[in-house]
């Protein structure tokens, strides 16, 4: 073929010429210049002329116009939809701004309570009325879009679920108005609360405090780009109206009779806004809500929310797998026991938000269909100041109502004796060297911690020691340093850094389950044995989830073994659950690859006011020690973690050695089995070799006169040399199937034991039919090399190519045999006859005679028989029978050639005039009788007539009698009849037994058909 550069130059020149003059295109078309060349020969000549090309261009243009119209209509529909949403927003009444000052006064309190409703754990005994709660819940949703005029206000980034009781905010409002993140989400607290100064966090990703309001419309790229400016204007107007509305409702306490199902529906569609705002972080404790499709209930939010207690609770950074969005931020306040309120509708909206965060999994069925507040109200329980930190993914047990109730019972024990908040919290810094939660949740999902539950890390992370470096936050989550300044407890700085780690299976040294000393007293009603039972149960049954997977519930990873390697801490008894060492080893065997992927986590030391990060080696903690004291774990520094890591590394070395020994043992067993199998196959090959040698004598005398014979002899040589190799390669392929070199041998194996018609060419004839043409000429002793090494992929490709070439040649050779030629001609003639018969048949049904119908049936039967014959030759017969057809065809051709050669050698004899005339007459009669069924009769008659009439030619016979005796009148009459019957007989093949009567009838019907 021509070089690519030349081809490009020619193509460019041709295109330029065509662009200069369109008239030059016509001769190019007429010359049929093709751009595709095969060995220099142009193929695929262009079939389009200028007119057809223009038509094609017109059709293309029409299609483009239709597509453009569709896009325009789609954009118009989107714009009208957005406009309708905006119009619906404008219809709402704007409340008076009279109560706006009251809102300003309550901002400080509301900032401190921003996420109190986000906490699934309940609060001390006394609850406010449902009216109080409803108002607070409404204000939580309404307060999301206030301007940040107070620098001390807590800036939170979350989801704008600002909806009043009439549900004015349509689902698309969050997208269209670009107010998807809540600037200030706070609750004007109506009940008495202890005044507290606003706490300011200096988190590295915190929102700028002087953030202007118009940034709301610029942060998120609007899906409706064409109306961006319009939407910005509308959003500003909407924000102004909402400010006055919030100020009006800040002091009103009334029950929110709001459809929770509508909230759920609206929250699902808010997902786009939320996901784009997910990278912003609040100023204070960020309680990250997990991205779970199944969080449909308020108590399921235990996995996502850091519990804000009535006492001074440290902000907790609870981050979860695949969480992109810190939903709410806030800082807890020191509340009196009667100042807490129930958590009902916000949980509904939070759950709806969580559903919206799940993306494609948002429409999965929820375990509980009801979103009624009653479900939440009956689960509301009092709790002393406790940070309930739950590492999700949640397990299947918690998705059921009973499982969730049990989870709540484990977390929220009866703490009536501990309702006095100031008495509980001072004990915690002394015991835990920090403000630690009085209860650490050891729930059913303890085994599901993504970070490979390590030496007492049973889903518990002690916030007090500042070691809550959650390593399940992915996609570059925010780092939040929440400085909490309490008016009663003093300063406790907790830098909870949530670093963006792709997949941290490592725990932190200090974040091993640090059980609070008050756990036993707080959760007095629930025995620790139940916690142990839950931990052990979930350790054995549940699975962890891969951080990189899109959905932690649906995309489960087999990381259960990593979590089940190490024991859990029973926080009530401060001891590990008893997992057998064999189970740990068995799972360590399976987790060697997973260890290589682990990143170095951070270790946050247990100091009160600082947080150290230390890189841990990429090894997990061993199964080693059985009991770990809480205070000891808090007091130990990174040295202890290093020792644990060293022991873990030693355990891994032991496991590696053990694996290597097992691997070597398995290999030795496999090799021994291979040797036995190879010996068995070698015996079979020897037997086949003997059989082939015996059969070779039968087929060795094939004729060598024909070229095709020479080709087949070549095939036999190739087959003879390759059969033994193939059989040996099969023997190896049975043992080396684990290696990559067994691809070809397996294919040879499959071919050698099936019917020979689908086998490769070098195995053709290996069946036990009489015409087997394969023989093994090489002795078996040479075949000691491993043929699986010889048959590489390259050799396999060559053998496949040779097989294809041989099969193609034999197929073409079969098509040229007389048998197949006759069958093909029969098919062609019968189909032509049937077609003509149908075209000549009367148009009206019922006129076809029985004779014509039977004739057509016989022709159809003959066509069917011919087609079946062709099918049998190519698809039913084995290779030996096909080769016998070729052999017979070669024999017939050789006989013909020999006869022709004899004729050529014999000298021609001079013929007399009478003999020449008789020969000419014979030729004429044969030409007239082509296709006639009574040809044999005519051939017999002509020589007899000439022989009888020859002596009488010179005697006194009359001329007409002489002519009659010579057959001239009969010949002329028969010629007329034959000429009349030719058209019908030409449609009938020679093998059709059609009599002259049927042919004559068809001939007589033709004028009638023509006149109709």
UniProtKB/Swiss-Prot annotation:
Residues 1-223 are annotated as: CEP97 binding. It holds the Pfam family CaM_bind. Residues 611-621 have a biased composition (Basic and acidic residues). Induction: Up-regulated during the transition from G1 to S phase of the cell cycle. The highest levels are observed in S phase, after which the levels decrease markedly. InterPro entries: CCP110. GO terms for cellular component: centriole; centrosome; cilium; cytosol; protein-containing complex. Phosphorylated by CDKs. Ubiquitinated by the SCF(CCNF) during G2 phase, leading to its degradation by the proteasome and preventing centrosome reduplication. Deubiquitinated by USP33 in S and G2/M phase, leading to stabilize CCP110 during the period which centrioles duplicate and elongate. Ubiquitinated by the EDVP complex, leading to its degradation. Residues 49-90, 640-709 form a coiled coil. One of its GO terms (biological process) is positive regulation of cilium assembly. Residues 64-82, 781-821, 909-924 are annotated as: Calmodulin-binding. Keywords: Cell projection, Cilium, Cilium biogenesis/degradation, Coiled coil, Cytoplasm, Cytoskeleton, Phosphoprotein, Ubl conjugation. Residues 978-988 have a biased composition (Polar residues). Residues 67-82 are annotated as: Required for interaction with CEP290. It comes from the Eukaryota. It is found in: Cytoplasm, Cytoskeleton, Microtubule organizing center, Centrosome, Centriole; Cytoplasm, Cytoskeleton, Microtubule organizing center, Centrosome; Cytoplasm, Cytoskeleton, Cilium basal body. Changing residue 170 to A: Loss of centrosome clustering and protection from anaphase catastrophe upon CDK2 inhibition in lung cancer cells. Residues 611-633, 949-992 are annotated as: Disordered. The modification Phosphothreonine is found at residue 194. Necessary for centrosome duplication at different stages of procentriole formation. Acts as a key negative regulator of ciliogenesis in collaboration with CEP97 by capping the mother centriole thereby preventing cilia formation. Also involved in promoting ciliogenesis. May play a role in the assembly of the mother centriole subdistal appendages (SDA) thereby effecting the fusion of recycling endosomes to basal bodies during cilia formation. Required for correct spindle formation and has a role in regulating cytokinesis and genome stability via cooperation with CALM1 and CETN2. Interacts with CALM1, CETN2, CEP76, CEP104, CEP290 and TALPID3. Interacts with CEP97. Seems to associate with discrete CETN2, CEP97 and CEP290-containing complexes. Interacts with NEURL4 and CCNF; these interactions are not mutually exclusive and both lead to CCP110 ubiquitination and proteasome-dependent degradation. Via its interaction with NEURL4, may indirectly interact with HERC2. Interacts with KIF24, leading to its recruitment to centrioles. Interacts with USP20 and USP33. Interacts with MPHOSPH9. This is Centriolar coiled-coil protein of 110 kDa. It comes from Homo sapiens (Human).
